[in-house]
Amino acid sequence: MNLAQGKKALLSAVAAAALTVVGAASAMADVKPVTIRIAADLTGPPHPAGISMSLFKELVEKKMPGSEVRLFFAGSLYRIPEAVEAMTDGNLEMTWGQFGKTAAVDPYMNVVVGAQLLTTPGAIDSLDSFETIKFLQDRMNKVHDVHIFGSGHLSMYMGAGSGSRLISPADFKGKKMRSMGPAENALLGALGANPTTMAFGDVPPALQTGVIDGLLTSLGGFNSTKDQAPFFTIAGINGIVGDYYWIGASNSWWNKLDTEQQAILNGIIINEVLPFQKKINFCNDKRLVDKYETKDPSKPGIYIMNAAEAGAIKTAAGTATADWIKSKTPDAANMWVDKFAMEAAAAVAANPVGSSDLEKTDCAAMAKWFTTYERYKKPKKKK
């Protein structure tokens, strides 16, 4: 190839690359923008789910130019039950929901809630393959006109936070404890505590003023309340609480989108946001345990119960959660409570600790995300 031919080939390659860029930009410009309000009961960054919601906003606004995604954290627009009703009525586009909290509008959503069922990371990561989840997706679609894309992970180390250490059932007795939902109330009741449900955004002032003595929450929740509840106790993976996020959209809104809009949003949620959320949640658990773990239960920090201590909680709780769920749902739901327990046991057996790809996540590479987005500050209430 002579100099002239080489120059011509180079110019052709540059032109082709330019056309590719222009074509991609043109394709993006052809996509109709969307306006999405997404309601959540969790707090914003650095909470891992809050970071994931912020990533969702960034990706939608980048891939669908002209779009606007408005994030409503900590129940600032709707709490989860009201958000579901708003989606059913066509008054809200999307919700980052939670199964246990959704039970207030559909008791069936409780069938996947319960401690010491999914007790390995790999088992939790296989949740979307469960027949129970597919049943709930179908039910939400038919009964509430809500499309659930998939599930997300709460902290695998859900636990109990307080101003003093809660380890034995006796430590819980008489304590006013914030619960995440009615299913957890049954567990707390079995331990002798006085449970109350409230949105997470209301928790810090309630702790500070003594309205509650402690709370059930995630490690992300502990990180937000460690000044008010510095003693956080966990009983292994899902040892005290077992609940999960779901991400859904109003069919009333979703069905008005064209196929290209739906494909882009579905790809963002399924292929990018949900896998990212599970990884950053895993890494958040790891970094917080690494930073705040204490082996001395008399000192503040994250204390992981030994087998005997966790066993005492499990014995005291008994079948309280499953019994409560069965008592509050139609008889037809009982089979799904039992089905989920069987699916969970099979998933744990198939995914022992250390075997999942999730546990191989490079958390050093994920560290930057904890400072990527502006730290969330709860808006001050107007006087």
Question: Which stretches of residues belong to each language-model region?
Answer:
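Bacterial N-terminal signal peptides that target proteins for export
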Residues: N2-V14
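Bacterial N-terminal signal peptides
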Residues: S12-G23
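N-terminal secretory/targeting leader peptides
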Residues: V14, D30-A123, H147-K383
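Sec/Tat signal peptide C-region and signal peptidase I cleavage site
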Residues: G23-A29
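Short, solvent-exposed loop/beta-turn-alpha elements that line the ligand-binding surface or hinge
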Residues: T119-V143
